[in-house]
Amino acid sequence: MAAWKSWAALRLCATVVLLDMVVCKGFVEDLDESFKENRNDDIWLVDFYAPWCGHCKKLEPIWNEVGLEMKSIGSPVKVGKMDATSYSSIASEFGVRGYPTIKLLKGDLAYNHRGPRTKDDIIEFAHRVSGALIRPLPSQQMFEHMQKRHRVFFVYIGGESPLKEKYIDAASELIVYTYFFSASEEVVPEYVTLKEMPAVLVFKDETYFVYDEYEDGDLSSWINRERFQNYLAMDGFLLYELGDTGKLVALAVIDEKNTSVEHTRLKSIIQEVARDYRDLFHRDFQFGHMDGNDYINTLLMDELTVPTVVVLNTSNQQYFLLDRQIKNVEDMVQFINNILDGTVEAQGGDSILQRLKRIVFDAKSTIVSIFKSSPLMGCFLFGLPLGVISIMCYGIYTADTDGGYIEERYEVSKSENENQEQIEESKEQQEPSSGGSVVPTVQEPKDVLEKKKD
């Protein structure tokens, strides 16, 4: 009886899971060649995938959840997916170069999703890009609501101006990353002080910063640098994104599961420097911490001890390490100042030698990872080709040896035949020319074997 109940419960769970999958898939449309003509009437969030792609298969259940969520909240954005290998011409038209590629298509515009492939991040991307490029903030209440909702956002304050045109151009390029708003001076909170109008501000880290054209340069570049919070929990994707900012990244490499004083102290030091020395370093540095050293070891092609502090230049793959332990904030500030004035020598880089080293390191890492994960598979992948190559080399070597031996035997045989012919010709010349005369025979010279017999 108990076994029957367990079996019934298992069947019920399986049925629920299957129904959930069917329901989720029902809100994601499979797109074909007709999509090209019919898409302009709606806003589409599309996953361009390949059936053989492993990352695409991992994304599939997340994508089904995105479709269900967008439908349940009444979003005007339709969710679909397209096999880019079957409809390669359409995929090429939208600039698909890898799999999976997530794009939001709005009219003639196509926006790439470049963030993490989680349900929340994809939905946030769809909401941000599908709406207005510049969203108005008509009241202080709305302004305060946006501050609570978004960790980082930009605001243009003022009327029509050349600065606003630059702001719109920057927003059209960077809307895939962050939010852009506009407001009047009356709507801005009282704690905000503006020296001149119009102005562009970024609100983040519980404060604000004003764009200065003379100090900050190009507006788009400034927005691209300031779209990150000053302190971040880093991963490989964020480090890649920070490469476009031109900033150095000061990282505390720690083990978050380790609660020892040494690990928590380094993290606190980086946080304190990011907070208290922002005015000095925020133009040149991004601060954060990373859990574990696996990614950093791959990036640096070296084994870093944990915990430690490393400063990365993600634009050219250089890095800076201190030859002594950082014990307090003053040590970290001194380390940063030494980097800025060139006292600390950079390591790594993207020179030809480093690129060759990278190729060797990547090949070694791949081989080691294969043997660690599956020794039998590693033996098969690398042992079989080596065995085939060894057999081929042996065959070529033995073929050359046999050929030389046969050629040598042929020359010896040819020489023996010529000698035999000469002996026979000599005998014919020594035979008597007439039948009755007796001619004394001349003894032929003996060869070596005959002499030995005598």
Curated annotation (Swiss-Prot):
Residues 412-454 are annotated as: Disordered. It is found in: Endoplasmic reticulum membrane. Gene3D superfamilies: Glutaredoxin. PROSITE patterns: THIOREDOXIN_1 (PS00194), THIOREDOXIN_2 (PS51352). Disulfide bonds join C53-C56. It is an enzyme of class 5 (isomerase). Probable disulfide isomerase, which participates in the folding of proteins containing disulfide bonds. May act as a dithiol oxidase. Acts as a regulator of endoplasmic reticulum-mitochondria contact sites via its ability to regulate redox signals. This is Protein disulfide-isomerase TMX3. It comes from Pongo abelii. The gene is TMX3.
